[in-house]
Amino acid sequence: MERFGRLLRVNLSTGSITQEEISPSWIEMFIGGSALAARLLWERLRPDLDPLSPESPLLFITGPLTGTAGPAVGRFTVCARSPATGLWGESNCGGFWGPELRFAGYDALWIEGRAPEPVYLWIHNGRAEIRPASHLWGQDPYAVQAIVREEVRDPLARVAAIGIAGENQVPFALILCDHGRVAGRTGMGAVMGSKNLKAIAVRGTQPLPIARPETFQALRAQANRALREDNLTRVFRETGTAGAAEYFDLLGSMPKRYYGQGAWEGASKISGAAMAETILSGVSACHACVIACGRVVTIPEGPYARTKAKGPEYETIAAFGPNLLNDDLQAITHLGDLCDRYGLDSISMGNVLGLAYLLFEQGRITERETGGLSLRWGDIRPVEILIAQTARREGFGALLAHGARGLGRAFGAEDLAVEVKGLEVPYHDPRGVAGIALSYATSPRGACHNQSDFFMVELGQSSEELGIPYLDRHQVEGKARYVAIHQNWRTACNSLVLCYFANVAPSVALALLNAAMGMGVGSAHDAASGGAGLAIETGDQQPSGCHAGRRPVAQAAPGAPGRWRSGRLRSGSGDHAAGILRGSGVGSCDRPAHAGNPPAVGAGVCPGGEPVTAIGVPSRRTADGSGSA
């Protein structure tokens, strides 16, 4: 097996830095990325562990394809106990930082402890050091990148940094690197801030060995040709993820007015096409990617003028656009940039703001609580103030910083908060694409459109090799099995670590892995590794217990497209709400802690709280691969 498995362990309390090798048997079973991270963290994530305590580990991890010349392999994963949910925390990020960590000689970075003063890490070609960062505290991540590169005297150093929100341990704080690529979900920036760790700079020139280079090169060329010819990747290349806005609006899957409205006339003003026609000035790509879905924009004049900024992704557009009934693309760009600079996940920030606007409309929140701010749909003038307050935990922002569940609880409206297991729901409404409802309910980290982007399958993305047939997006019956299969496959993708946008066929992905590592695994192993990783990630939530919400939303919103589904979701013998979020019982779990061992492959939590075993997982091995379950 070619080199993969070098872990750098840093204890910020003691200042110790050591290197170690990850067990080859674990790599064989879990590959890398989030599944391997789940196995590495399993013994350390005790049910009573405070996610923001010095003892809580933070793990940055790559996959065996990261940094190679393979298709769209620039991503890495950050994992820890989530301060947002208290459960499994995982965030996936693109750019160049992950490949650079491997070039520097490491495949994973384990951080524990808490530095007495702010610090940053400098990792370069097999060496690592802890440096003072008090002068960086309070700086935004882009400024930190520039300062750190100057200090390490290397303009090519890649820097991952947190903003003020991470410093203040806001539960949905992000980590930003490169040209605005972010590890946004589950509050990994807060965990980093709790350790007084402002940034991690990496630089390396070490080559990555490929076991069978000629085979790998041929597979790479084949995959990239398919990418260039694929219609979906062509859309991403031409309009970015924002190009999905009008289409999702047409399907009724882009939420408006905090999931309370179906029809809206502003989608065409904030779409990827509108961006291309008005403020687009360039594109950006991650390592080894021919898609280049990133947008670069210029706003020449007006209150949001800037010479160069990251164009907003679909989630940011939906968060600060239709969610608040705002059709000003320049304002959305500005608010998304503010979230990046303050270090806040725009999905969660937009969600909690939407709830605040709704509660203001209902009279549960008044100007007395908001500090004189009037929260009216379509008026986004207060949003800039509230983003800053949230990052600083000041004023009304101190309440918003507790997330949607916390805000709802504070005003006796927890049933109105659109979240799953404490994680705010992203902007893909299950009433327009039914399968994502079950994915939200069963995702280990809470509401997640990346644990399984099943809505893409429902919209026609090829999944023939997985045995998933064409499924009507409104169909509910018989869909659970295919959601489970897709979740396992996406967990395997997160182990490699592959960008979903490439939509690499499973056979090609496995062939690339075998060529890179000199392995000989087949599709059954791939499905098993995905199921095993998902089982451990899900198992992390079981000791803590996950409880259901009370907003099933079993009816379509006013003005929704004609076929927008209402009613209830049936799965197995249970009858569960096909609503916006957890529904009446979806995702609940009150089982006692497991006694020392990870759950079996395929074991999970059913929407009603009963054990789910091996749904769509063709393996019965235990999570550590030791034998039959």
What are these regions (language model features)?
Residues P618-A629:
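Compositionally biased, low-complexity flexible segments
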Residues M1-N92, F96-P618:
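Intrinsically disordered, low-complexity segments enriched in small residues
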